[in-house]
């Protein structure tokens, strides 16, 4: 299987997000990389599903709460930026304060 660097990055994000999803389902609090991967993968999937940039940005603030992550993690993530593939092309999505 031949993958571009971007495709490899997407697979890495997905794998980390899957691990984070499983840990969250078991009741564990997510650490920094898990929280970032969880949110990033959800944003990429929402874009792929056809949501608008504004909808994806808002959606990114609803995925995790302070109760879902370890202490200090929300302050470590002031924003998340991801290049997501929308039906009309690739766009940069920025979510400010993704964990309110």
Swiss-Prot record:
Subunit-level organization: Heterotrimer of UreA (gamma), UreB (beta) and UreC (alpha) subunits. Three heterotrimers associate to form the active enzyme.
Segments passing through the bilayer: none
GO molecular function terms listed in the Swiss-Prot or TrEMBL record: nickel cation binding; urease activity
Cellular component terms per the entry's GO annotation: cytoplasm
Entry's Gene Ontology BP terms: urea catabolic process
Keywords linked to the UniProt accession: Cytoplasm, Hydrolase
Protein name: Urease subunit gamma
The enzyme's E.C. designation: 3.5.1.5
Alphabetized Gene3D superfamilies for the sequence: Urease, gamma-like subunit
Entry keyword annotation includes Nucleotide-binding: no
Subcellular localization: Cytoplasm
Reaction(s) the record says it catalyses: urea + 2 H2O + H(+) = hydrogencarbonate + 2 NH4(+)
Pathway(s) per entry: Nitrogen metabolism; urea degradation; CO(2) and NH(3) from urea (urease route): step 1/1
Family, similarity comment: Belongs to the urease gamma subunit family.
Species this chain originates from: Burkholderia cenocepacia (strain HI2424)
Source taxonomy: Bacteria, Pseudomonadati, Pseudomonadota, Betaproteobacteria, Burkholderiales
């Amino acid at each position: 299987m031949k993958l571009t660097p971007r495709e490899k990055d997407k697979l890495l994000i997905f794998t980390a997000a899957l691990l984070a999803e499983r840990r969250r389902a078991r009741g564990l609090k997510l650490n920094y990389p898990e929280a970032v991967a969880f949110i990033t993968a959800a944003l990429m999937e929402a874009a792929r599903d056809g949501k608008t940039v504004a909808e994806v940005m808002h959606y990114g603030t609803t995925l995790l709460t302070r109760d879902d992550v370890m202490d200090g993690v929300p302050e470590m993530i002031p924003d998340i930026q991801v290049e997501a593939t929308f039906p009309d092309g690739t766009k940069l999505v920025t979510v400010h304060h993704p964990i309110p």
